[in-house]
């Protein structure tokens, strides 16, 4: 796939991701329309700011940009935030990083994902991206 060629994309406003303890996180996903038949790499952004309203304007510029270039882009509301269940206990907690690592592995296992998963972000999302990378998840 040429990453310079723009492709048609779909947006899924609320994709549930169920953590190992049963807590459901909510994700908004943008991906090429043919990702099911031609799996693509995934880019995860894992934030405490509500995807429904808090970061919508920015998300709707950033994530479709990458999706149109052949990536699945996933914007997750962290545990206890936005449309996700649970309680957020602290910044950069073990629970937050466990959830992010679980999400990386969950994404890699989806039929529309090639198995390659990266994270991105600025500020909070940049910090937790580095912290998850330090854990060296499989994908």
Feature map (PLM): residue ranges:
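N-terminal cap/lid segment of alpha/beta-hydrolase-fold proteins
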Residues: 1-38
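Cap/lid segment of the alpha/beta-hydrolase catalytic domain
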Residues: 34-108
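Beta-sheet entry/capping signal
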Residues: 26, 42-43, 72-73, 115-118, ...
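Primarily recognizes the serine-hydrolase "nucleophile elbow" in alpha/beta-hydrolase
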Residues: 105-139
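Hydrophobic alpha-helical segments that mediate membrane insertion or helix-helix packing
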Residues: 22, 100, 132-133
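Conserved G/P- and acidic residue-centered "switch" motifs that form tight phosphate/ATP-binding loops
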Residues: 22, 80, 121, 125
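Generic beta-strand/beta-sheet core signal
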Residues: 27-30, 45-46, 76, 120-122
């Amino acid at each position: 796939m040429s990453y310079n060629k723009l492709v048609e994309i779909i947006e899924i406003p609320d994709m549930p991701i169920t953590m190992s303890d049963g807590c459901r996180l909510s994700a908004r996903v943008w991906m090429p329309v043919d990702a099911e038949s031609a799996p693509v790499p995934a880019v995860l952004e894992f934030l405490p700011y509500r995807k429904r309203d808090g970061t919508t304007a920015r998300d709707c510029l950033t994530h479709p940009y990458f999706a149109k270039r052949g990536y699945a882009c996933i914007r997750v509301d962290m545990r206890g935030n936005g449309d996700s269940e649970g309680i957020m206990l602290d910044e950069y907690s073990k629970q937050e990083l466990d959830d992010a690592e679980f999400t990386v592995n969950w994404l890699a296992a989806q039929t529309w994902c090639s198995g390659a998963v990266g994270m991105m972000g600025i500020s909070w999302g940049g910090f937790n991206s580095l912290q998850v990378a330090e854990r060296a998840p499989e994908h």
